[in-house]
C-alpha cells in the first residue's frame, strides 16, 4: 500500500534521504556477509514476562526464521497489504515479525500490551486488521485471553496467533513455526520476491494532534528508516555495536529508533523488559550494552548506579523527553564515555534529537531546517511556528511563539485509511505542507548572524492529559467516567507526582449516593473492559465540576480540591 504522494517520493528520493531497499533486503545482506555474528538476544527473564523462552539468534538463524515464517503465512493465504496487529514485548520475535512483514508486504500494527478489550477492538476496527499476533501474557496482563475475546466478536479477524506457553484454546501456536528454521530449504534462501517496494507502508502507529482523537499513521520503509538514520547519525551506531532496546513496539522509539535502526546497520540487539533501574544496569554490565535509550527523568538516578566499567563501555545515551519541557529539571552531569543525546517526542508524529551541548539547551529546537550532520545539504525535517508573526506583531505580548508545524522525510501527509476506505484522511496542514501538531511553543532566541532561532515546546494547545508516559484527551475520559449510571457528572484530571515523575490520573465524580458510588464506579470500569491506563488511581467526590463559560473543565481547580481532600 502506497500512502506517500508521487511528489514526496520524487523529492526525498532525489535528495538521497529515501532509497529503493526494503528493510528485509538490508538485513538479508548482513545475514549473507556475517551469518554467524549474533543479531538478536532476548532478555533472560522473558519467560516470566510473556511465557516465551528467551532466544539468542545469529544473523543467519534470524533470516532462516524469517523465511520459514513467510512460507508458512503464504501457505495459509496471507497476502500483501494484510494488516496484522502485533501485541508482543520487545524481543527477538518482534524483530523477526518486522522482517517477515517487510519481506511479504504485510502491514504491522503494533498495539500496546496493556490495551483493554474495548481499546483493542477500536484499534483493530480502525485499521481493518485481518490477523493478530500476541504473546500469551505480559506480566499480569492476560493479553492472549483479551485478544481471543475480541477476535471472537469480530468476523473480520481471520487468524489469531500466539507466542508463548499457556495460551488459551483457539489460538494458533506460532512458537513452533518460529523455532522451525531448520526446515527451510537452502536453495533460494536469499531469493527476494517483489511483494512490496520501499515506499510501501510497513507499520502503523497511533498519533494525535492535540484535541483530535488518536489516528493510525502508516509509515513506509523509507520513512521508518529515515527516523532511525536521523537519530543514529548522532549516536554513531554501527555493525560492531550492541544496542539495548527496552521501549515497546507500539511507539516510534521502540520500533523505529530501536529495532528498525539496528536491523538497518546490522548492530546486535539486546532486548530488555524494563522493571527496575538496578536490573537494567545489571543487564548492561552483563551483555555489554553500548547504546541505550532512557526517559530523561531517570538519568540522574541511572547515572548514580552505573559501575565504572559500564560507564566506559557506553557510546551513546539517548534521553527521551515529552513535548513539554517547561517544568523539567535537567541533570547535567555525564561521567561516562558516552555522548548524551536529548530526544523530544512529538506524540509519535515526529522525533527531534540533538547532541547535548549544555543542559540549559535541552528542549530548545532550531526553527527552520534540521540538517544532516554528515551531509548538511540533506534536510531531515523542517519546523515552522504557525501564528508566530501575528504573535510578534502584538506589542503587549510578553511571549513570541506559535503552534509547531512540521514536515520532512519521516512524516506522512495522511492517516492510514480507515477500514473500508481507499485513501487516508489528510492530516491538517498549512498551505506549504507543514503538518499541524497543536503543540504550543515560544521563541527562545531570535536569529542573529550564525545563531539559529530557537524555540521551546510549552505543551498541548488542546485539552490533553499526560500521565505515566501516556496521553489521553480529557473530554474522552470525562465521557467515559460520566457514562456510569451512578454518576451525574465527571471529569478526569492529573495530580503531579514528585519532580520529573509521572503524574497520577484521578477522577472527580458528582454523585447522589457517595456511600456506594466508589464500588459501583469501579465495577462499571471493569465491565467496560477498558485499558488499565484509563483507570484513575483514586476518585474524589465534588458537588459540581468546575467549568468555564464555554464548558471547558477547569482541571486545575480539581487538583486543588484533591489536595484539600488529601486524596492525591
Summary of predicted features, one role per range:
Residues 106-176, 284-289, 293-313:
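Structural core segment of the AMP-binding/adenylate-forming
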Residues 35-38, 162, 167-168, 179-227, ...:
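Conserved pre-ATP/AMP-binding loop-to-beta segment of ANL
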Residues 226-242, 250-291:
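Conserved AMP-binding/adenylation subdomain of ANL enzymes
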Residues 121-125, 132-134, 408, 425-534, ...:
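AMP-binding/adenylate-forming catalytic core of the ANL superfamily
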Residues 175-180, 291-293, 303-395:
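Gly/Ser/Thr-rich phosphate-binding loop
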Residues 1-57, 61-74, 167, 189-196, ...:
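N-lobe entry segment of adenylate-forming
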Residues 15-19, 39-91, 95-99, 119-121, ...:
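Conserved AMP-binding/adenylate-forming core of the ANL superfamily
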Residues 162-163, 530-553:
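AMP-binding/adenylate-forming catalytic domain of the ANL superfamily
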Amino acid at each position: 500500500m502506497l500512502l506517500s504522494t508521487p511528489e514526496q517520493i520524487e523529492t526525498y528520493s532525489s535528495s538521497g534521504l529515501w532509497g529503493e531497499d526494503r528493510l528485509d533486503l538490508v538485513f538479508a545482506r548482513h545475514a549473507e556477509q556475517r551469518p554467524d555474528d549474533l543479531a538478536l538476544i532476548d532478555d533472560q527473564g522473558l519467560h516470566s514476562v510473556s511465557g516465551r523462552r528467551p532466544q539468542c539468534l545469529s544473523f543467519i538463524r534470524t533470516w532462516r526464521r524469517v523465511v520459514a515464517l513467510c512460507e508458512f503465512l503464504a501457505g495459509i493465504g496471507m497476502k500483501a497489504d494484510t494488516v496484522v496487529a502485533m501485541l508482543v514485548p520487545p524481543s527477538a520475535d518482534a524483530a523477526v515479525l518486522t522482517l517477515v512483514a517487510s519481506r511479504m508486504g504485510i502491514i504491522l500494527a503494533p498495539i500496546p500490551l496493556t490495551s483493554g478489550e474495548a481499546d483493542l477492538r477500536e484499534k483493530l476496527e480502525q485499521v481493518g486488521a485481518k490477523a493478530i499476533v500476541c504473546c500469551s501474557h505480559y506480566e499480569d496482563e492476560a493479553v492472549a485471553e483479551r485478544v481471543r475475546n475480541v477476535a471472537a466478536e469480530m468476523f473480520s479477524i481471520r487468524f489469531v496467533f500466539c507466542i508463548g506457553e499457556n495460551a488459551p484454546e483457539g489460538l494458533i501456536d506460532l512458537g513452533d513455526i518460529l523455532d522451525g528454521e531448520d526446515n527451510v530449504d537452502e536453495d533460494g534462501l536469499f531469493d527476494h520476491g517483489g511483494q512490496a517496494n520501499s515506499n510501501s507502508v510497513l507499520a502503523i502507529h497511533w498519533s494525535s494532534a492535540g484535541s483530535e482523537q488518536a489516528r493510525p499513521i502508516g509509515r513506509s520503509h523509507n520513512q521508518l528508516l529515515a527516523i532511525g538514520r536521523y537519530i543514529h547519525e548522532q549516536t554513531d551506531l554501527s555493525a560492531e555495536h550492541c544496542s539495548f532496546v527496552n521501549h515497546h513496539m507500539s511507539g516510534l522509539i521502540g520500533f523505529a529508533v530501536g529495532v528498525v535502526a539496528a536491523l538497518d546497520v546490522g548492530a546486535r540487539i539486546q532486548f530488555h523488559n524494563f522493571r527496575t533501574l538496578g536490573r537494567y544496569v545489571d543487564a548492561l554490565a552483563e551483555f555489554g550494552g553500548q547504546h541505550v535509550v532512557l526517559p530523561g527523568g531517570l538519568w540522574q538516578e541511572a547515572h548514580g548506579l552505573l559501575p565504572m566499567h559500564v560507564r566506559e563501555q557506553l557510546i551513546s545515551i539517548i534521553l527521551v523527553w515529552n513535548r513539554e519541557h517547561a517544568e523539567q529539571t535537567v541533570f547535567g552531569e555525564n561521567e561516562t564515555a558516552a555522548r548524551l543525546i536529548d530526544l523530544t517526542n512529538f506524540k509519535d508524529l515526529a522525533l527531534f534529537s540533538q547532541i547535548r551541548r549544555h543542559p540549559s539547551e535541552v528542549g530548545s529546537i532550531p526553527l527552520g531546517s534540521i540538517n544532516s550532520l554528515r551531509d548538511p545539504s540533506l534536510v531531515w525535517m523542517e519546523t515552522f511556528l504557525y501564528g508566530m508573526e501575528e504573535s510578534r506583531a502584538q506589542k503587549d505580548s510578553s511571549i513570541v511563539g506559535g503552534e509547531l508545524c512540521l514536515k520532512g522525510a519521516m512524516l506522512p501527509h495522511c492517516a492510514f485509511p480507515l477500514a473500508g476506505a481507499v485513501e487516508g484522511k489528510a492530516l491538517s496542514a498549512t498551505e506549504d505542507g507543514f503538518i499541524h501538531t497543536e503543540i504550543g511553543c515560544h521563541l527562545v532566541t531570535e536569529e542573529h548572524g550564525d545563531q539559529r532561532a530557537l524555540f521551546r515546546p510549552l505543551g498541548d494547545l488542546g485539552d490533553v492529559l499526560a500521565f505515566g508516559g501516556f496521553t489521553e484527551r480529557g473530554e474522552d475520559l470525562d465521557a467515559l467516567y460520566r457514562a456510569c449510571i451512578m454518576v451525574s457528572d465527571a471529569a478526569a484530571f492529573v495530580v503531579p507526582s514528585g519532580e520529573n515523575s509521572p503524574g497520577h490520573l484521578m477522577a472527580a465524580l458528582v454523585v447522589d449516593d457517595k456511600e456506594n458510588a466508589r464500588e459501583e464506579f469501579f465495577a462499571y470500569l471493569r465491565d467496560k473492559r477498558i485499558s488499565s491506563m484509563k483507570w484513575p488511581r483514586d476518585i474524589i467526590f465534588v458537588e459540581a465540576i468546575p467549568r468555564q463559560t464555554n464548558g471547558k473543565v477547569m482541571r486545575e481547580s480539581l487538583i486543588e480540591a484533591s489536595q484539600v481532600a488529601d486524596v492525591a
